[in-house]
A protein has these predicted regions:
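Short, well-structured beta-strand-loop connectors
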Residues: 261, 398-411
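Short, Lys/Arg- and Gly-enriched loop/turn segments at beta-strand edges
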Residues: 233-237, 411-423
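Gly-rich Lys/Arg/Thr-decorated short loops/hinges at beta-loop-alpha junctions or inter-strand turns
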Residues: 37-49, 170
Length: 441
């Protein structure tokens, strides 16, 4: 099965379906003792994984068995929140057929789905600073990714569609299955469109998602689209300029350190102290010789620091800026400490999701988004060549070519970290550039 599995994953163009889009065939080229399916879906409002686990538990566990065998693991674990009752029941009902697998239930806290947090929750191990789970013998993958793997192995089905939650200020919140490459605007129409005239759209969750144009495209990593009305507090936060953040840090930061109390990286034992980086940025203070701008590399961008701050400051955005400056100057992260254990009070510092939803002013949008798998027939798709971490895929079709849905249209460049891309509809190739391929039905 091992060679067959990797070959199927490569051919199908499978990447991480919920995060940065790391090519799965590379991630699975490893040896580990534990494989974790991350079913936490910790971002508020997103409803994809919890429904897929409830409806496709047996397929997912079968694929997890294959991955466990491939990496030589002793066990596989599905980690999810205990209040996903339908998913928990479905998984437990299927477990007797899978003796190497288990379910790990977690509380409703944020960010339970951060891969370093979930490794600690399931195994008690701490991933080193700037590290990845395989360094402690763990492979972490995503619910939809594993289901894509099942389809690739059993039916040679490539990744051409994506499950996406459509929510926020839309007429009918729902979770849909849509072809890759349709526009965000087109996808939102499946939920009845926005309920307001002036709005912004977040691609991803409200905490770690990014603002996108209605004319941007659905890709392999799109998990949710959240519509928010103009003037919403979350949009104001995302749009706050860096110069104002720096000014506010100098004026308002009182070094209370509430940000470090909730920081998931600090609570894993990593040397990240958001309040000290705020002090450094605001005053150029290096009074603690152990702190350098390099500490910003340890920030995962979860944004909890902002919502713990009584002054509404944004250490996460400052950290992101520092990382950008360091990267542009060729300065790499040299912080690689490996804590033996997390903070002793880590479990007491978990941040409740219901509290976070209220702080985000999203209570009115915290509603079900039932899964609707009705096929959507698109007339045109634009397939970005970089839907994953690494090098963009290389077009292997030409202008005027006729392609069938599922046909390979962009290939992995030789010896590159990349992923194949396939036609999500049948039609004619009407445009090929270095950035995307357009197919018209």
């Amino acid at each position: 099965m091992s060679n067959e599995l990797i070959s199927a994953v490569v051919q199908a163009g499978i990447v991480g379906a919920g995060g940065a889009g790391f090519p799965t065939h590379v991630k699975l080229n490893a040896k580990a003792d534990t494989v974790i399916i991350n079913g936490a879906e910790c971002e508020p409002l997103l409803r994809v994984d919890q429904q897929l686990m409830a409806l496709k538990a047996e397929k997912m566990l079968t694929a997890l068995d294959w991955i466990v065998e491939h990496v030589g693991a002793q066990r596989g674990v599905v980690a999810l929140k205990s209040h996903y009752h339908n998913a928990v029941d479905a998984l437990n009902a299927a477990l007797p057929n899978h003796p190497k697998l288990a379910v790990h239930e977690m509380g409703a806290f944020y960010p339970a789905g951060d891969e370093q947090v979930i490794v600690c929750e399931v195994t008690g191990r701490v991933v080193p600073e700037g590290g990845i789970p395989i360094q402690v013998g763990v492979v972490v993958t995503n619910v939809e990714t594993v289901l894509n793997l099942y389809d690739a192995v059993t039916a040679q089905t490539p990744v051409t569609q994506k499950y996406v939650t459509l929510t926020g200020a839309v007429h009918t919140p729902k979770t849909v299955l849509v072809p890759l490459g349709i526009t965000v605007r087109e996808a939102l129409e499946l939920a009845g469109g926005p309920t307001v005239d002036k709005y912004s759209i977040i691609n991803g969750g409200p905490m770690m998602g990014r603002l996108v144009s209605p004319d941007s495209y659905i890709t392999k990593t799109t998990k949710g689209l959240i519509v928010l009305p103009e003037g919403h507090s979350l949009l104001n936060s995302l749009n706050k300029p860096l110069d104002r953040i720096m000014r506010d840090a100098a004026i308002a930061c009182m070094q209370c350190s509430l940000c470090i109390e909730v920081c998931p990286r600090a609570n894993l034992g990593h040397r990240l102290a958001p309040h000290k980086l705020m002090r450094m940025a605001a005053y150029g203070s290096l009074c603690d010789e152990k702190d350098t701008p390099m500490n910003a590399y340890l920030c995962c961008g979860c944004r909890l620091c902002e919502y713990a701050c009584v002054m509404n400051l944004q250490p996460w955005k400052l950290n992101g800026n520092l990382k950008g400056i360091l990267g542009k100057n060729g300065i790499r992260n040299n912080l690689k400490n490996a804590p033996e254990a997390p903070h002793p009070f880590r479990e007491l510092k978990r941040y409740p999701v219901h509290k976070l939803i209220h702080q985000l002013d999203l209570d009115v949008y915290d509603v079900p988004a039932p899964l609707d798998e009705t096929p959507y027939v698109a007339k045109k798709v634009t397939l970005p060549l970089r839907q994953h971490v690494g090098a963009p895929a290389q077009p292997c079709v030409e202008l005027g070519d006729t392609v069938e849905e599922g046909a390979l249209v962009a290939c992995i460049p030789e010896k590159a970290l990349s992923a194949n891309i396939h036609a999500s509809i049948s039609g004619t190739v009407t445009e090929v550039t270095g950035d995307y391929i357009v197919i018209q039905a």
